[in-house]
Amino acid sequence: MLKYCARCVMPHTKPDLHIDEAGVCNACRAYGQRSEVDWGRRREELLTLLGKYRRHGSNWDCIVPVSGGKDSTYQVIRMLQLGLNPLCVTSTTCDLAEIGRKNIENIKKLGVDYVEFSPNPLVRAKLNRIGLTQVGDISWPEHVGIFTIPARAAVQFNVPLIVWGENAQNEYGGPAAAAKDNVLTRRWLEEFGGLLGMRVTDLSSTYGIGPQQLLMYQYPSDEELQRVGVTGLFLGHYLPWDGLSNALIAQANGFTTFDRAVEGSMVNYENLDNHQTGIHDYFKFLKFGFSRATDIACLHIRRDRISRQDGLEIVRRHDGKFPWSYLGKPLAKILDPLEMSVDEFIKVCDQFTNKRIFKRDGDGALLKDRHGNLEKLNYDNA
């Protein structure tokens, strides 16, 4: 049985989530403390910090890792408003959607220099398959690349400051805010990047992928990071962070949304770049019993935009549906580069399904409806 937060709709199975004696999760508690934050003071801290890294025309002031999504569009807009000269860096996603390409081009039109690093697609497809079958995450190589490539760019272009968006795991401003020891280490990057227990070196020793094919997935050495003084900050620590308002600001600056709620979601303004995202989100549902619709519903419940009851109904309607398509692209075509059939994919799904949280028949087999959807044992506390 799943236990749910009494304020939002997040189950206790979410990694790093804790539900206290009152039945409230730590994410809701943390959000409640935001009203006590002096955002004016935080903004001044941000301006002071950014001032230390301004190059006054001699180089870029900072690196902004961007995907083309609403949040990275917002980050670029804010950096420009604050008078910085950012270098935008993209580690191109696995299966870039047309709308994702459009939003990347839109960021360029905001008036920034832009580096787009596209991985070897044959190697990436192998890594997608390895990630999916070994750790249940088709997006494993993408999640590695979005941290390694900006760090490599920082070293290569001698730009110490990396400006990330929101840090969902830690309530702090990032290493750049530290009075000392503020240079990123390889260990910090690997821990923050979240490798899910599979190291890049494993790929060479176990799967025969040569190190020369994995350069973009490896962090710079500590010596390289120290030489440049690479550090980073999280913009969401210094400015109030809200996905919906970020989306509205991004839209006002040319960002394009989908023509309907994205499959498995409840909104049309996020995760628009990669056709593989539906698979990634579905595996989160299989492992932990929640997915994208739950994530978004919780954000809106905490901000009093929807009631908890409405959130429960939205989650039941949208969360964890079998990913037959994403952004309109059929599952079979998404799996083609991985050389995997839909039947093979379903077998992998079953291997990673947490059978303790889904309904089964008398023989222990998972119960699925005619669309292949699972049903959780419970969608709320009894």
Stretches with model-predicted labels:
Residues M1-C62, R78-A382:
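Nucleotide-activated chemistry modules centered on ATP-dependent adenylation/adenylyltransferase
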Residues C62-D71:
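Short, glycine-rich nucleotide/cofactor-binding loops
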Residues Y74-V76:
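Long, structured ligand/cofactor-binding scaffold of large enzymes
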